[in-house]
């Protein structure tokens, strides 16, 4: 079964778009990318040039990038459009919409690769029955380098940082979560 890449927040989209051709690196392993409606909204709501580039990239890859509608995502988007929500209420909405989509079966079966911007991970127990692999942005880049897809993770990380994404940490975390003790570790690299 093919691993699906899930973004629990929009941070990786902003980091990868900061580098020329960077968004295509998200598809480089040949794995489908799944976003929830709220993650897409979070990345494109401003209407800035960067947001429009992300929106255009998503639209240009309908067979590789899938946007899943969620109940919470639709409610949050409506309240943000109506300007009835507070900024503090946005905390962790992306993560919660991803787990809503998983719980409702809207994403299908795993294994899943959760791509996080930083080294703050959800408690592995939260993944439940799903075989999951958690990886940081830099861990993803290192995986691409080790697979021969890119020549240097360090160069791309440096470009991200020099193009406004200074907060992307050079932390390599790449860890599997088994759905049960008997299951094999998940893998994601080609």
Question: Where are each of the predicted segments found?
Answer:
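H-loop/switch region of ABC-family ATPase nucleotide-binding domains
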Residues: 116
